[in-house]
């Protein structure tokens, strides 16, 4: 919720830049292979560590907050809309099962968490949310974060960008400098910077530079605390 892109995009969504947001994506996709050995272990006989053990015992999206939080804000969940229907599907556990067998030196017959889980949620007002979870396969870190609106589009990974329809470009204060600027591609860098400057989130205006100095996930942890102070 507290990444610069997500916060500025939230402000744009709340100001109507994207029109009505009808679909959103979020995820926690983070290959944890370098980290499994560093999670807390319950004594020297614990071969797995708490996180791998938790994934082994629980099915579904076991860490939905990273993906769901930002898009729930953008869709006004519990601020005029609510989640109504959910369906989820996961792959089999191939890597997770192998990790347990490698560490425990025994056969793993029931690793419950699939290597990749996809969840679809439909809201009361007819919006759709897609959330993904994957901590197993070798791929770049990705929270997806994508908003699809009736007048515009925002995307964080793998390339950050915004696209707006022709009328919304002018309405949002963007003055195109090239003739073919349209919703078929992301805004050029200069126009994107203009848009972000206009709709910079108030919390970032007040605490952004301080957050960069303090750090903590690039300043996001600090911004999260600042939101409590700001409220």
Where are these regions (language model features)?
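Active-site rim elements
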Residues: 54-61, 106-108, 133-134, 208-218
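Active-site beta-strand termini and strand-to-loop segments that position acidic
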Residues: 119-125, 149
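C-terminal helical cap and adjacent loop that interface with cofactors, partners, or active-site loops
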Residues: 72, 140-158, 163-231
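Short, mixed charged/polar active-site loops
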Residues: 128-130, 153
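Residues that flank catalytic or metal-binding motifs in active/ligand-binding sites
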Residues: 82, 115-117, 143, 150
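Short glycine/serine/proline-enriched coil/turn segments at secondary-structure junctions
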Residues: 32-34, 137-140
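Predominantly a Rossmann-like dinucleotide-binding segment in NAD(P)-dependent oxidoreductases
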Residues: 2-111, 228
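A short catalytic or substrate-binding loop motif that flags glycine-/basic-rich loops and adjacent residues
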Residues: 65-66, 110-115, 123-124, 138-139
């Amino acid at each position: 919720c507290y990444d610069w892109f997500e916060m500025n995009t939230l402000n744009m969504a709340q100001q109507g830049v994207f029109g009505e947001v009808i679909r959103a994506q979020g995820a926690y996709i983070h290959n944890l292979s370098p980290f499994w050995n560093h999670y807390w272990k319950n004594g020297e006989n614990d071969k797995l560590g708490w996180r791998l053990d938790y994934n082994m015992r629980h099915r579904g999206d076991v860490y939905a907050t990273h993906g769901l939080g930002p898009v729930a804000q953008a869709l006004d969940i519990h601020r005029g809309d609510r989640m109504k229907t959910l369906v989820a599907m996961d792959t089999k556990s191939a890597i997770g099962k192998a990790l347990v067998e490698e560490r425990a030196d025994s056969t793993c017959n029931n690793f419950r968490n699939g290597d990749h889980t996809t969840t679809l949620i439909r809201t009361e007002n007819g919006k759709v949310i897609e959330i993904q979870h994957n901590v197993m396969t070798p791929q770049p870190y990705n929270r997806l974060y994508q908003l699809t609106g009736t007048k515009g589009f925002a995307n964080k990974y793998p390339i950050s960008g915004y696209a707006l329809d022709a009328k919304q470009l002018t309405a949002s204060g963007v003055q195109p400098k090239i003739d073919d600027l349209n919703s078929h591609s992301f805004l050029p860098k200069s126009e994107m910077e203009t848009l972000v400057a206009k709709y910079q989130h108030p919390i970032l205006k007040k605490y952004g530079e301080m957050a960069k100095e303090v750090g903590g996930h690039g300043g996001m942890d600090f911004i999260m605390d600042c939101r409590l102070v700001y409220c």
